[in-house]
Amino acid sequence: MDLTVTHITHKETYKEPRDDDDDKQVVAEIMARSFIPTLITTIPWEGFHFAGHEIQITEGKDCYGAFVWPSALVLCYFLETHAKQYNMVDKNVIEIGAGTGLVSIVASLLGARVIATDLPELLGNLQYNISRNTKMKCKHLPQVKELSWGVALDRNFPRSSNNFDYILAADVVYAHPFLEELLMTFDHLCKETTIILWAMRFRLEKENKFVDKFKELFDLEEISSFPSLNIKLYKAMKKNRRSA
């Protein structure tokens, strides 16, 4: 099917927003990576340009995790524009709360070995999106696995076999009752050398409280901020690392 789309060019180096004008410019560039197809198809989808590929994402209407949220676009943009600093090639990566799979797809296209995880009711659409966008395009075929935060972690993700270089997360903190379980999951999946890259949109006081609790277990660094979106991008590693 021939779809007319606009391909986006971008800078090779990324600059942190310094003021409102810079913030708006970078945010506009990030948001321009998405597009709506010009033809109506039987299965509606939204398009994105990352890692040199057109990515087609099917969203849902029944739950929060079935949409592509701005935090996911911010994290995808960061991974692409920081590919040298945070090299994904052959790295072991897990995404928690993968939702539609966009972040996992981009990490896979950048060369990572990816496990995309979410709740069981989201896995069908997640698998569909990942398969259609990574087959014959990626060095490593991504896996899709169920992960309910805080549930059966030792059985499904035993610490002895967790060897993740990166944990990716976008918009996993919001008004849900599982923040303690989310923190437990971050802690369980992390080893001393694991890097967490986490994009977060601040909406309510709950987000600030979670960050405070997160800091009790992890060294947290704000590496980028997008005030017009109320989104911050964090890098984190476990506290009290022997290598620190």
UniProtKB/Swiss-Prot annotation:
Residues 1-20 are annotated as: Disordered. GO terms for biological process: methylation. The keyword S-adenosyl-L-methionine applies. S-adenosyl-L-methionine binds at residues 69, 97-99, 118, 149, 170. SUPFAM superfamilies: S-adenosyl-L-methionine-dependent methyltransferases. The keyword Transferase applies. Keywords: Methyltransferase, S-adenosyl-L-methionine, Transferase. Belongs to the methyltransferase superfamily. METTL21 family. Protein-lysine methyltransferase. This is Protein-lysine methyltransferase METTL21E. It comes from Mus musculus (Mouse). The gene is Mettl21e.
